[in-house]
Amino acid sequence: RPLNVPINEALVSYEVDGEQVNGIIVQPSPGEAPYPGVVVCHPHPLFGGDMNSSVVIAICSALAHRGIASLRFNFRQSVEGEKLNETSVRDVETGLQMFDGWEMVNSVRLGVVGYSFGAAAIARASTSLTSARALAFVSPPVAAIKKSSLGDDTRPRYFIVGGRDRLVDAEALSEVVSSMKSQANFETLD
């Protein structure tokens, strides 16, 4: 699709465990609904990460220009120090369920993508994200990927890291991904 395709954005709010989660649904327009859909998870809130992260917005925009709807949301107080906890996992699970139920999204063409902390949350929640047909990870923490069950996952998985990323060791991530079962792809961007 050409890059000049108009994009519609809508603020959404939904409940997770009795608390409000705010998000934005980005929908390509014009387009033929129901759209494929992707839930996009942001980097660590303690380091300024939220749904308006430049990388998250770029991902959502790129998806919309390709005819794919997206949901990005702000994690609730999802951290204990710098650690991931079950709150962030529930936020991803519920966001995907909510998006799956949206009439403009094709429920058999869903995926999830996470950036940094968001990638770790998806890795931890991956076994419960059964409606996601594909998983993507941008600069994921290597330890989170190692600890997850992604190695045995049979869905398509895509891992991408910048060649000059100071937090993610591209070589270590490449080794972890290469040991996974089928459909796991790794790319380093320079």
Residue spans of the language-model regions?
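An N-terminal hydrophobic leader/cap segment in hydrolases
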Residues: 1-15, 21-31, 110-112, 117
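Catalytic histidine neighborhood in serine/cysteine hydrolases
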Residues: 71, 179-190
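Primarily recognizes the serine-hydrolase "nucleophile elbow" in alpha/beta-hydrolase
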Residues: 92-155
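Serine-hydrolase catalytic machinery in alpha/beta-hydrolase-like enzymes
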Residues: 14-105
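Short beta-strand/loop motif that positions the catalytic acidic residue
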Residues: 153-154, 158-161, 165
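Conserved alpha/beta-hydrolase "acid-adjacent" motif
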Residues: 166-172
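The conserved SAM/SAH-binding core of class I Rossmann-like methyltransferase domains
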Residues: 71-73, 138, 160
